[in-house]
Amino acid sequence: MLQALLIFVLQIIYVPILTIRTILLVKNQTRSAAAVGLLEGAIYIVSLGIVFQDLSNWMNIVAYVIGFSAGLLLGGYIENKLAIGYITYQVSLLDRCNELVDELRHSGFGVTVFEGEGINSIRYRLDIVAKRSREKELLEIINEIAPKAFMSSYEIRSFKGGYLTKAMKKRALMKKKDHHVS
């Protein structure tokens, strides 16, 4: 019974680590992924080693499977809380909605406005890049000012240039100056 509990706990730890390592790889953070992979591999070997010691012990196998499933749930939760990376929202509007554009820019979001031809009239599209950790804030602003907007989103693997890059460099310089002054 203690072995089954140990296997379950190891899986609860292992699978979220596996999830984080996978996300780091997808986000092109290979060195961090490799470091996390060391821990992941060690836990995997220990856990599976206990299961393979006695394949007739069905409690160990069930603990492994249930722990894996519970670990997936926990890994998904942790990933949402960490919100690693960036996201782009494309917001389609019937009018230019300067109020929304101004509020987004005032809040520190990079916004590009496009004018396009819809089936019956001119339409406007906003391309907004944000840290995933600020996605909720972004959606609250959009929903408050333009609740009927059509939105689609996708995650960004990498980017270069633009407002967001300048803002990040500016923040990094400010931190360096603050650090040297302290």
From Swiss-Prot:
Chief site of localization: membrane
Subcellular location: Cell membrane
Membrane topology field: Multi-pass membrane protein
Database matches in Pfam families: DUF2179, DUF5698
Keywords, alphabetical: Cell membrane, Membrane, Transmembrane, Transmembrane helix
Source organism superkingdom: Bacteria
Record field: transmembrane: 6-26, 32-52, 58-78
Record's GO cellular component terms: plasma membrane
NCBIfam families: PRK04164.1-4, PRK04164.1-5
Similarity annotation: Belongs to the UPF0316 family.
HAMAP family, sorted: UPF0316 (MF_01515)
Protein name as annotated: UPF0316 protein BA_3420/GBAA_3420/BAS3170
UniProt organism field: Bacillus anthracis
